């Protein structure tokens, strides 16, 4: 029953990597400013580096796949790889993001992040090593190759528990947090609530596949018997419970996270 320090990408990751709670560091929001709250040399990877480890990283460890280069032995350059696959992105100064259909596994940056880490897991090293592999999905946008949708037929999708008056006993700040007139109102109007859940599950399945690739590489690793695995996420997700979507709330759906240790 693990819960994040704060249900938002940037402050949650800053808390984990710095070991400092948001109310200590001051990092509460997404704003691409986590460097203001975490000094160079304070991060988790920096601690491993100081302890003599070889430290590799790929993907979304900090917010927006950012990293402090001096805190890593090597870190994957994502180049022009996209978290959502090829599409229309920031055309002529405008942020108009639309993903092209018929994606392949390798069209999404997570595939390449796993490739990067798999290659490093295969090497026998003279010094201990730490590898951080940050998978972007199932973050928005909910896009994945179509084959991952087949296990989630639209007519079998079940909506989460919900009642129309669920916010009647919630004070104004809580209603503002839920935002029933934002995402939820749009899904009710469009009739695509189940389609959104289906797409979310498909991105989860895509991530499950990539985690499997990492575990397969771990099984073949020369250091398999002397390796600790930690599986963690930065926040939970709401899919319409209490008329709320996304994270940014203090209900269990948004704060609860997976936390698995294998040693």
Tell where the protein language model's regions lie, with residue ranges.
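Formylglycine-dependent sulfatase
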Residues: 1-263
């Amino acid at each position: 029953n693990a819960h994040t320090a704060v249900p938002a990408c940037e402050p949650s990751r800053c808390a984990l990597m710095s070991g400092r709670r948001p109310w200590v560091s001051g990092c509460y929001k997404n704003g691409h400013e986590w460097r203001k709250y975490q000094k160079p040399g304070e991060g988790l990877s920096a601690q491993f580096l100081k302890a003599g480890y070889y430290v590799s990283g790929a993907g979304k460890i900090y917010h927006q796949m950012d990293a402090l280069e001096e805190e890593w032995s090597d870190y994957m350059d994502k180049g022009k790889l996209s978290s959502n696959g090829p599409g229309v992105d920031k055309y002529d100064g405008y942020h108009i993001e639309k993903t092209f259909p018929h994606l392949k596994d390798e069209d999404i940056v997570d595939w390449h992040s796993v490739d990067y880490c798999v290659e490093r897991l295969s090497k026998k090293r003279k010094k201990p090593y730490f590898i951080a592999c940050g998978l972007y999905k199932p973050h928005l946008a909910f896009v994945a190759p179509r084959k991952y949708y087949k296990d989630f037929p639209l007519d079998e999708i079940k909506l989460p528990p919900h009642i129309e008056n669920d916010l009647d006993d919630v004070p104004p700040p809580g209603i503002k947090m839920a935002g029933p007139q934002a995402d939820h109102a749009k899904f009710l109007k469009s009739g695509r609530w189940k389609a959104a859940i289906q797409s979310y599950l498909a991105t989860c399945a895509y991530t499950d596949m990539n985690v499997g690739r990492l575990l397969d590489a771990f099984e073949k690793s020369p250091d398999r018997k002397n390796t600790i695995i930690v599986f963690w996420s930065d926040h939970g997700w709401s899919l319409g419970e209490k008329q709320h979507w996304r994270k940014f709330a203090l209900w269990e759906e948004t704060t609860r996270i997976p936390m698995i240790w294998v040693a």
